[in-house]
Amino acid sequence: MSALMQEMSDRALRLGVPLSVQLDLTYRCNEQCVHCYLDHDDHGEMTTAEIKHLLKEMADAGVFILTLSGGEIFMRKDFFEILECARALTFCIKLKTNAVLIREAQAARLRDLGVESIQVSIYSHRPEVHDAITKVPGSLLRSIKAIRFLKSQGLKVIIANVLMTENMQDYHGVRALADELGTKCTLDPTVTPMMDGNRAILDLNAGESALRRLFRDETFVGNADEFCAPPPAPSGDDMNSLPCSAGHTACYVSPYGEFYPCVQFPLSCGNVRQQRFIDIWRDSKQLKEVRSIRLRDLSSCSQCAHGSTCTRCPGLAFLEGNMRGPSTADCEKSFARTGIPSVNLLAKKEKVSPPRLVQIQIVPTITGSRLSSLGAAASAVA
C-alpha cells in the first residue's frame, strides 16, 4: 500500500468512513470455474435504477474506491450505464473480470471512462490447464486477446492467479505471460468455501509440500530466509490490532443488495433495498460486533506464536463457525511458511470432531411484484 493510500485508510478508520466497497453486479458468469464460491443462478439482481440509487448513497457516505465485480460484470447489458453513473459520482473504479467479452470497442470505452484498473483472472499460461479450470474451451486465448485490447488503450491490467492443485506448477508461466503482456500479476494460494458453506472445493487447495515450495521461491517471496523465519512474539500493539479492514474501512454488497463486511465474510448486516447504505454502515449490530474484535479477544489466536504475523481471515473463521476463532487455511499457510504449528493445528491433532460449518441460504421474498433476495441467513451446523 502506498503512503498516500495508507494515510487515507488511517483517516477513514478514524472518521468511520467506508473508504472502499466491492459491489458485485451479478453472480451470473460465462465461465464455470472449478474453484468458484458463488451460486451462479439469478435470485433477483438489483435493477439498474436500484444500483444507481445505491451508488449515490455510497458517494454520500464517503466511499472513494469502488470495485465492480461478479460473476462476470459484462454479463449485465446495463454495465456501461452503471459505470457511467459511477464515474459521474467520481469514484475511483476498479474492475474484476475474466475479460472474455471485452473487444476493442469496450476497451476504448473503459479508457474514456477513466477506469483505474482491470483485474483479469488467468489460471495458467497453458490453454489446456486454464480452460479445464474455467470449463470453457478457448477462454484463455480470448482473455489474452482482451488484455491486449486493454493494454493498447493504455489501461492498467492486473492478472490474478488463484493457485490450486490443478495449476500450482504453472505460476512461473503465468508471471512470464504477464511480463510479456506488460501487466502486473498477483498470486493467491487460497481456495475458499462456497458462500453456502459447502467446503467440497477446499480439496482443490494446494497441499503443504506445494505451499512450502512456493514460500521458499525467492522470485515470489523475496528473501526466503526472512519470509520463513519464526515469527516474533506478539506485542501489546499486536494484541490491540484489527483483524483486517472488513467492516472497518471496507465492505461488500451482493447483487441482491445484501451488505456484508467482506466478500469472504458472509455475515449479513442488512440489505440496501430496505435500508440506506449509511444506516447499515453506522448502525448494524453485526458490524458493531465485527468492529469490536481485537487479537486479544481471539481465544486461540491470542495464545498463538503466529499472532504477530498471521494473515488470519475473520470471514474464513466465520465460515468455520466462529468469527472469533482461527482460520484453518491461514494456520496451514503459517505452518507451511515457518514449520511451526499454530495453536489451532495442535488442538486439531487432539480432537476427532471437525469444526462447525456455516450454511448461508438465499431466502427469496416477493417485494411488490418483483422477486428480491433477502440476505444470507447464517445458521451454524454442528
Residue spans of the language-model regions?
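Flexible mid-to-C-terminal extensions adjoining Fe-S/redox cofactors in radical SAM and related proteins
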Residues: 1-4, 8, 258-259, 264-382
